[in-house]
Swiss-Prot record:
ZnF locations on chain (FYVE-type): 64-107
Protein name (record): Melanophilin
Record text on subunit structure and interactions: Binds RAB27A that has been activated by GTP-binding via its N-terminus. Binds MYO5A via its C-terminal coiled coil domain.
Single GO MF annotation: small GTPase binding
Gene Ontology CC terms, in alphabetical order: cortical actin cytoskeleton; cytosol; dendrite; extracellular exosome; perinuclear region of cytoplasm
Alphabetic keyword roster: Coiled coil, Cytoplasm, Disease variant, Metal-binding, Repeat, Zinc, Zinc-finger
Residue ranges of coiled coil: 373-496
Biased composition (Basic and acidic residues): 232-243, 409-420, 558-569
Organism: Homo sapiens
InterPro entries named in the record: FYVE_2, Intracell_Transport_Effector, Melanophilin_FYVE-rel_dom, Myrip/Melanophilin, Rab_BD, Znf_FYVE_PHD, Znf_RING/FYVE/PHD
Its job: Rab effector protein involved in melanosome transport. Serves as link between melanosome-bound RAB27A and the motor protein MYO5A.
Chief location: cytoplasm
Amino acid sequence: MGKKLDLSKLTDEEAQHVLEVVQRDFDLRRKEEERLEALKGKIKKESSKRELLSDTAHLNETHCARCLQPYQLLVNSKRQCLECGLFTCKSCGRVHPEEQGWICDPCHLARVVKIGSLEWYYEHVKARFKRFGSAKVIRSLHGRLQGGAGPELISEERSGDSDQTDEDGEPGSEAQAQAQPFGSKKKRLLSVHDFDFEGDSDDSTQPQGHSLHLSSVPEARDSPQSLTDESCSEKAAPHKAEGLEEADTGASGCHSHPEEQPTSISPSRHGALAELCPPGGSHRMALGTAAALGSNVIRNEQLPLQYLADVDTSDEESIRAHVMASHHSKRRGRASSESQIFELNKHISAVECLLTYLENTVVPPLAKGLGAGVRTEADVEEEALRRKLEELTSNVSDQETSSEEEEAKDEKAEPNRDKSVGPLPQADPEVGTAAHQTNRQEKSPQDPGDPVQYNRTTDEELSELEDRVAVTASEVQQAESEVSDIESRIAALRAAGLTVKPSGKPRRKSNLPIFLPRVAGKLGKRPEDPNADPSSEAKAMAVPYLLRRKFSNSLKSQGKDDDSFDRKSVYRGSLTQRNPNARKGMASHTFAKPVVAHQS
């Protein structure tokens, strides 16, 4: 049994003919229902008599259980009923040839009612099918019921078939069907409801259906689109009385439908009721149906459990699908946040690797010697560079040149220094590239035989090294600022309720020291002076470019004015004796005053 019924290929005449056939079917059902109601009334009266006779068992031994006539030998002998076990007279019972015994008239009527109401059949069919029959057709053609014969058919269908709201139908489809004109032949895919099965499969009385019918009669009068007659309300009055009487007694002929009846009235069902009702009386229709559903809920609590196994769960499936969709959207948002966190962790790991590399390559040997006494590759490179600088210093100090030659050397050395220092401020912001360039420049051989190297003084070599260290330190500080920014973002994510997994490597901080301005040494002291501290000239400091330029210009002007400038003692004291105690781990952290003047 499909959930949708496509009747778009039917013309209006064919649809009207189908509706007339369904209307005749409803009329026959109503007549049969009235007949069965009369039989049920008789059965109820007989049951009350039996209850009285069951209390007085000795009375049934002498009198008939139905007509209360005394038994007579050969004229009115007593016979026991095979159904109830009571004794009746010959006129109040009949022979059952298949069972080879007597059955009293009340038990025979009960069997007739059960066969006429098809309870013996629908108790098994309801567990297999949920919707079929003429009610399915009438629901599919609901859009065409807005015409002449529509209201009467709707009222009959509501009284005989529909006593529940839509469980798994789509409310939008019925709204489209109501909006279409009568002559429209567009395709209509209308939903089929759970309660379609009830009216088509049940010919017995249903009090909740009649209450729904009564609530729909005044609404049809109020609606401007409907043409009603007084016969519907007149027929509904006896149905209401019979339905209330049957609900109080709970007769055996009245059966309920456990699989279609809900245990509670949800807001979605009220919405479906509002769409099924005409515009004039939607509230009255919804209230009547809600009252009918309340009575059905009370009756369904006493049903066997095997009938509750095939309940239509389409509403639950739609709700579950909606919940799953919301879960998927939340999961997608959580996945995007997790991907951002993963990218941040990768960035942090990369920055930590760069910091580790810079600490291994840029940290002076003094800091490493204090932390660990093991000599590393950086110590070996620093020592080799120191030896080369000593050779250069000795070669330059041995040459005695005039002031003109020294001026020419200074003029040649100044563009060389600009070339070596100029590109450094424009270096790539990537820390790894700057560190690679620094290592490559430190490892480049400085041959004393090179004429360009002769023109460069020892102070220029030292200033170049200071520039490299300063640039590297600034890049390390920039990397640390990026790390702090990332940590602040992670803290914000954690404050928002997201969990951030730390990276595999522990967080390390840079051990780079903060360099102070370099010391050139006092001019009044010689390196061999006992007051001069060799360890005070050990640190290489970051000097700004403008100060370095001013320092070189002052040296050049002093060379011009005074020829008695002793270069050998001053420069050799600042370069060749660079922290001799660094390898022993006994370096002092005192610094000399930055005095730049020559002896007059």
